[in-house]
């Protein structure tokens, strides 16, 4: 699979590095629990996020003031992290979150 958009490629590369460093949580349940615990500093949301994930994670993040960053497709995120499609990823490290914001469409947060 190719990702022609250089911003998406950079975001995926940073997510992969963060995941290997255990600074990225994946999946609705893990991200939701970390949001409730207050340990997530931003959430990357797949472009094709399901209504269920949007309801459970995106609204919770927005309600807690956690920035939401638009990502590529769930399939592209999953392929980079060696997992099936990943709709949401929670970032635990502030420096990584900053890098992801820079990579993600000029750093503009998405609407809930």
What are these regions (language model features)?
Residues 11, 27, 31, 39, ...:
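Amphipathic alpha-helical interface surfaces
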Residues 47, 72, 93:
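Short secondary-structure boundary segments
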């Amino acid at each position: 699979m190719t990702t022609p958009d250089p911003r998406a490629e950079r975001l995926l590369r940073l997510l992969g590095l963060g995941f290997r460093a255990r600074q990225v949580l994946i999946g609705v349940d893990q991200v939701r629990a970390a949001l409730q615990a207050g340990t997530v500093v931003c959430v990357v949301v797949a472009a094709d996020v399901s209504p269920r994930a949007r309801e459970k994670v995106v609204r919770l993040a927005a309600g807690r003031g956690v920035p939401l960053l638009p990502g590529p497709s769930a399939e592209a995120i999953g392929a980079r992290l060696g997992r099936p499609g990943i709709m949401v990823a929670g970032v635990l490290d502030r420096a990584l979150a900053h890098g992801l914001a820079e990579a993600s469409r000029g750093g503009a947060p998405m609407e809930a």
